């Protein structure tokens, strides 16, 4: 049987009256309970990882550290590698899929947004998605936003408060809104 992510990847748009749109909102509602419980009160990293496994439906390596509060709307479309650090107040809107490879650092208040609304006024309540991939040893600085369809290259750095709208190659530093290459590593 096809997963929700597989269905989403087959279409360019998900309109508000589509059956898929309804399915998405049901799944999102199921995730909200786990997010609320995880963010309520002190949790050891082991307890946080147990919640993340419920949220993602996947095994999470014990080397992953996530600071609370942490928000995700769907959860099942997040894949964590090893030795990842996610600082507090991160927001992962993961409907389009988020892959975080090994040794990645994600600063506080980072937003990974795999969903956008359709620009055409008659379809504006609909959704367009694109996967975000953060390659090995990348670092996303505090307050940055990465938009749908973007890949952050291996060893690359996104400077604080940047907005990444296009793919970032390996071994560079990007900064600004929209983010542009400011240095090669």
For each feature predicted by the language model, list its residue ranges:
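Short linear capping/connector segments at secondary-structure termini
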Residues: 49, 68-69
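Short-chain dehydrogenase/reductase
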Residues: 65, 105, 139, 157, ...
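Active-site/ligand-binding-proximal alpha/beta "capping" segment
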Residues: 165-166
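Flexible, glycine/small-residue-enriched loop-and-beta-strand segment within the central core
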Residues: 70-80, 85-152, 177-185
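Terminal amphipathic alpha-helical/low-complexity segments used for targeting or macromolecular assembly
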Residues: 1-63, 179-182
């Amino acid at each position: 049987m096809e997963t929700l992510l597989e269905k989403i990847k087959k279409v360019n748009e998900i309109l508000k009256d589509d059956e898929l749109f309804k399915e998405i909102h049901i799944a999102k509602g199921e995730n909200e309970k786990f997010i609320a419980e995880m963010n309520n009160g002190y949790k050891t990293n082991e307890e946080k990882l147990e919640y993340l496994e419920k949220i993602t439906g996947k095994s999470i390596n014990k080397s992953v550290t996530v600071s609370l509060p942490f928000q995700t709307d769907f959860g099942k479309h997040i894949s964590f590698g090893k030795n990842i650090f996610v600082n507090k107040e991160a927001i992962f809107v993961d409907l389009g899929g988020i892959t975080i490879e090994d040794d990645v650092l994600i600063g506080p208040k980072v937003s990974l947004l795999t969903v956008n609304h359709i620009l055409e006024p008659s379809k504006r309540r609909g959704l367009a998605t694109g996967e975000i991939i953060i390659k090995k040893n990348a670092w996303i600085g505090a307050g940055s936003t990465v938009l749908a369809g973007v890949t952050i290259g291996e060893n690359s750095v996104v400077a604080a408060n940047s907005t990444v709208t296009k793919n970032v190659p390996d071994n560079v530093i990007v900064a600004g809104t929209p983010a542009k290459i400011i240095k090669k590593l």
